[in-house]
Amino acid sequence: MRTFREDFLWGGATAANQYEGAWDTDGKGASVSDHCTNGSHTCPKRVTPEFEEGTLYPSRDATDFYHHYKEDIALAAEMGFKVFRMSINWTRIFPTGMEEEPNEAGLAFYDRVFDELAKYSIEPLVTISHYELPYGLVEAYNGWYGREVIDHFMRYVEVIFDRYQDKVKYWLTFNEINSGTMPMGAVLSLGTIRGYNGPVTEVPDEPQIRFQGLHHQFLASAKAIRLAHEKYPQFKMGNMNLFATKYPYTCNPADVLECQKQMRIVNWFCSDVQARGYYPTYIERYFDEKGIKIAKEPGDDEILRNGTIDFYTFSYYMSACETADPEVTAKSGGNLVGAVTNPYLKASDWGWQIDPEGLRYTLNEIWDRYQLPLMVVENGLGARDELTEDGKVHDSYRIDYLEKHIAQMAEAVRDGVDLMGYTPWGWIDVVSASTGEMAKRYGFVYVKKYDDGTGDLSRLRKDSFYWYQNVIRENGTGASRGQGICRSRSEDHQRRRFYRRG
């Protein structure tokens, strides 16, 4: 029977904008994320062109990996990490995005990080652009809407590829690139918000601008991949998709067709371009219906053909249902992708519906479509952790969530899926990208940092730390119920109470 491969890449995932902090240290510039205020589940964060005195911008300090990287990497090694997903902050290398020469202090920082990972034989998995678009490029070009950004991106890519060619093997070009197919992608992913001041949920939606920006990201990704294939054959280049698995709300053929349409636009379009090297025919009708006309230059199609990915990665947190019935109003509150609540699934406190079986289904669908090695590079449960007086976090609800998803990954491997690794999101507590809060915690490691900006940043191991340590030690077999830490009856009760019906 097929099991997780012996060289399976167990680890954890982070992003510089949510974790690194030190936003203006050693010559770093401001990114789009640095211009986002704090928020909550009920009050959306805002983006401001100018920094407001007295307003908290949580990404500026985050949980301070910049000054704690040795301690944090030691914790990752203690758990047994084989891979460490992180991003390079573009603005630490090119502060405004438009400099001719890179910032040496920024490059030296990542040298130190990669050397520290190598000390523990941990493989870095580096996202080149993970919501760290220089704000200078927003002001100059309206973010990725400006084709000029491609050249600035490639200058950045050329520098980091050359600098870290002997230290990094696995690269991802853009984080959750398909978020640009949805209005929410305008802020962090595309940066098409020049002059906007207000809640991130109220940015005026302009599909023409979003999809033109996506076209420029496709070109930038393909150029980076071709450069890697031609000059650095040791590199393995991947994409990263936000996979929002969708089911028909009913077996009504109208619902099935609506689900197919949404799956194509949200989940398949971007990866079809990045994996196959061309625009799929189904997108033509969508563009016609929306009045979208992509401005292409001669040679664009060839660039896309020559820059396809080596492996496919994605985030998986939830699923949702789609319906063609306008009378159905049961929306999934808090669900990043909207859509209709699935009555068969429970949800987290943030309304994200929990669907472990959906991960197995998703892995099979992606594998059947592309026949490329796959990696789940984000997955996890955002929760309000309680710190006991003796410094413990009994997060049995997180263990329950993760063990069920790992079990379904194992089933997908038995189905024949080529799965190369797993990096749960926010293995150490980081700032939430969607809400800008610290209260929504994912980590195996608790960081004493709070929504009012206070906290001494000390790191504490949660119960899930020891559980995941055992999962890695046993190459996934330790994920089954009864393995890892023992749970008390009160902890089981806590886990049951955590979930609610969506």
Please give the residue ranges for each predicted region.
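Alpha-helical scaffolding within the catalytic cores
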Residues: 68-72, 298
